[in-house]
Regions:
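A polyanion-binding, active-site-adjacent surface
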Residues: 1-227
Length: 227
């Protein structure tokens, strides 16, 4: 059994958050092969993801795959050939109101971080798309507003994969255009807002323009690397 398979088994069997008293539904949700060249990192699975046993299964998945389709990917192709995971791996349960899903605590994020770190190192993705603030913070911790990040990309050299998450990307490292860096080796990180229907951010005209720019960058990277 190789290291990737061992990692998957450890994630599926993990009950560390449950042991710490968090009312999660154990059973990590992720998908995709080790050979994936693109990776999506979400916040955490929702209840429909648990039922379907696949990431981004509900309405948020529809919007996300609408964006990816505009960048050149069919949903079935992406799900089969690319990698999808999240900051925390298990469904965190409902929030106090009972209407929405609970945002994973900082402690839960720390518990799960070694898994994400290993995924980041093992899956040799040339394109990483953190989706939503929790995932974006794994790379862009110094940025507080989505409008300062969406529509931008950052190139992370390969040696940064040995660094502990979060990786701190500086403002000077951001670009709003893709230029292939074949000789360097590494990953392009293109953040996306959370595609949940409950989020109003993607619906604002000025933000739609930023999303369009992000989709164009993703499409350029997909084409350049034949993803």
């Amino acid at each position: 059994m190789d290291s990737f398979q061992q990692l998957q088994l450890r994630m599926k069997d993990c009950q560390k958050c449950l042991d710490e008293g968090f009312d999660i539904v154990p059973g990590a949700i992720f998908s995709g092969p080790q050979s994936a060249r693109a990776m999506i990192i979400g916040q955490a699975p929702g209840v429909t993801e648990v039922e379907a046993k696949r990431p981004f299964n509900a309405g948020s998945g529809k919007r996300l795959f609408d964006w990816l389709n505009r960048a050149g990917w069919e949903e079935s192709d992406f799900r089969q050939n690319q990698y999808m995971t999240s900051v925390t791996k298990c469904y965190p349960g409902k929030d106090r109101s009972g209407k929405g899903d609970r945002v994973p605590s900082k402690q839960e994020q720390l518990i799960c971080r070694p898994y994400l770190q290993q995924e980041f190192r093992i899956v040799d993705a040339v394109l990483i798309m953190p989706v939503g603030k929790l995932a974006i913070a794994q790379f862009f911790r110094e940025f507080k507003r989505l409008s300062d990040l969406i529509g931008q990309a950052a190139y992370i050299p390969w040696e940064h994969r040995s660094h502990e998450l979060p990786i701190v990307v500086k403002k000077s490292e951001l670009t709003d255009a893709f230029t292939r860096k074949e000789s360097l080796g590494g990953s392009w990180v293109v953040p996306l807002p959370h595609p949940s229907g409950a989020s109003l951010w993607p619906n604002k005209p000025e933000n739609k323009m930023l999303i369009d720019r992000a989709i164009n960058i993703i499409g350029d990277i997909r084409s350049a690397y034949d993803l």
